[in-house]
Amino acid sequence: MDFSQNHTKNSVESLQATRIFLFLSQIMRKTSQFILFLLLAVACGRTPSVDWTEGATEPDGRALHTLVLHDMPKGSRVWFQELFDGKTSVEGPSMNHYQGTSWYIDIPESGTVTLKYYGRPLPRRSWVPEAFVLQQQGRADTPMEVRYLFLEHPQTEKDEGCFASNYELQPADIIPQVKRVNYGTEPLELIESHPTGWFRITIGQGGEPKVECDDEDGAFYAQVTLSKLPRPLPPMTIEDWPDYAYRGFMLDVVRDFRTVDEVLEIIDLMASWKLNTLHFHIADDESWCLEIKDFPELTEFGAHHALPDWNLQETCALKPSANGKIGNTSFYTAEEYQRILRYAWDRRIRVIPEFDTPGHSRASIKAMQAYERRTGDSSFRLQDSTDTSRYWSAQDFTDNVLSVYLSSVYKFYGVVFDEVIRLHKEAGVPLPAIHIGGDEVPDGAWSGRDRHDMKEIFINGMLDLAEARGIRLAGWEDIVKGLKPETQERLKNSLYFINVWNTEGIEGFPVVLSPAAYTYLDLAYSDDLNEIGLSWAGYVDERKTFALNPNDYKGDIIGVQAQLWSSQLRSFEDATYQMLPKGLGVAERGWNGGYLEPFETAFNRFYSIIVAREMPVWERKGYVFKKR
């Protein structure tokens, strides 16, 4: 409204006051209506919610669980996440498996819906159905409140004697433990040859340290050692070096994403343990976590999560992972990835990205289907649309395997490899290898074609890419098994390492020990119901990781690695809890391959150092960790 100069000042002020009054009246009226709506919703119980009740284990080993859905709209659908366990409905509408951990229930009538179903007994409380979301046509998806009712279970008795921390520590007792120390001013007897990473620290009467080393790794490890020694420093000489050239940590950011800052904190922990390789698991079924500029759908589609549409199609994003998060953006831009690379390299840590193939490839398959829909370009297609294979993967997917006989698969990964090489080169950081996964290709994939021929085609196709670019590959042990002799020999020339559980039957390949029963940090600490984690390979605590003895294995062992898979994680706090303190056992075995004294004595010393010198640091930094 335009006011001319003929209007008086009073009329202008009066009109402005009237407008303000009307505006405030509207706000108050709408606020009152909203509050009234909330009060009515609460009073009438119209907010859909969930009650889940744990059932007792029956003689046949199953448990009858109960799921009650309150105030459900007719014709709606409820989604939730849970590990697949062959549920059998007994009462109420059926529970339908979609893909992976995703389930849905179609609601036939409004009101309260009760379901009873047989499933497995609950081994730990973190395995409950979770992330319930109400889906209605034409409306936004709505997370639902969930209440859990658990049975009373007897508590597992804790054997605290197994974790004594009464060893009398010396000033140089740190983790990893130093190999040679002499207190006083007498020098150590010098070793004739210096391994990579070797250093010597001499501390005189005045407490000033003198550092000797042969390379940048040794200089950094000497710095880490000095930062851990308690003050004041007594006169002493320390001489130390790593037993294994490869000391790794695998971080899965696909199933529960870690922010850049969280990754940097994990790198700091790795550096304090003198680990030197971050195996970065950034592409799998559940997500593709690295920006590739030529294929924006990899992250615009493959790193976003939403419920499938009403026709069970993933049209704009991938289905949720086990954590149930929807609408999240879970990937690293090229610049963020390079920031991680530089931060790690400053701490003498190399980064090896993993793109899991040819199984575990659902995110890339679905994303490139979206790319083809947008562009009409089928030359990067990853899955044959005419393939009628029927299979069920270890993680309960039926559509996650590359059609390795398509040349377009290798054209796609050529672009990916080129981008990764460029990012490392521009960051000024070496690229030791690209990890191609190779594990858990389900039986039934590539139906109608010889499975062994398909593996030969895949390995040779990836080797073509690597050799043309002068890079090396890495993979899980599956990639070397069942190959023709000529393919094995070719692979040896381009292979940096394979991650193995057991070296039996694997000869002539560089091996990084990664046995699940000793190095999978996502396995629960114990059978305590309140612990998070899986248990398919037993339980893993700091005693178990420390008990790994690489000397018990045959073969060309170049190192050891801890694995932190994230299907059971829901936060950074969960991640640090599963890492601390049991990750230190693997770090110790990478630096010091074995233990010379009796196990209980060696572990008592090791755990005493953790309690006295590691845990106070974690407390100050606010990390969540396992306390006893």
Describe each region flagged by the PLM.
Residues 37-45:
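Hydrophobic h-region of N-terminal signal peptides that target proteins for export
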Residues 45-60, 124-239, 473-485, 492-494, ...:
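Acidic, contiguous N-terminal accessory segments
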Residues 62-71:
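Short, well-ordered beta-strand segments enriched in hydrophobic/aromatic residues
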Residues 74-95, 131:
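Short acidic, flexible loop segments centered on an aromatic residue
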Residues 105-126, 130:
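Low-complexity, intrinsically disordered segments enriched in Ser/Thr together with acidic residues
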Residues 153-155, 204-400, 408, 417-422, ...:
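Feature activates predominantly on carbohydrate-active enzymes
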Residues 393, 397-495:
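Active-site neighborhood of glycoside hydrolase catalytic domains
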Residues 478-496, 501-628:
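Flexible, acidic glycine-rich loops studded with aromatic residues
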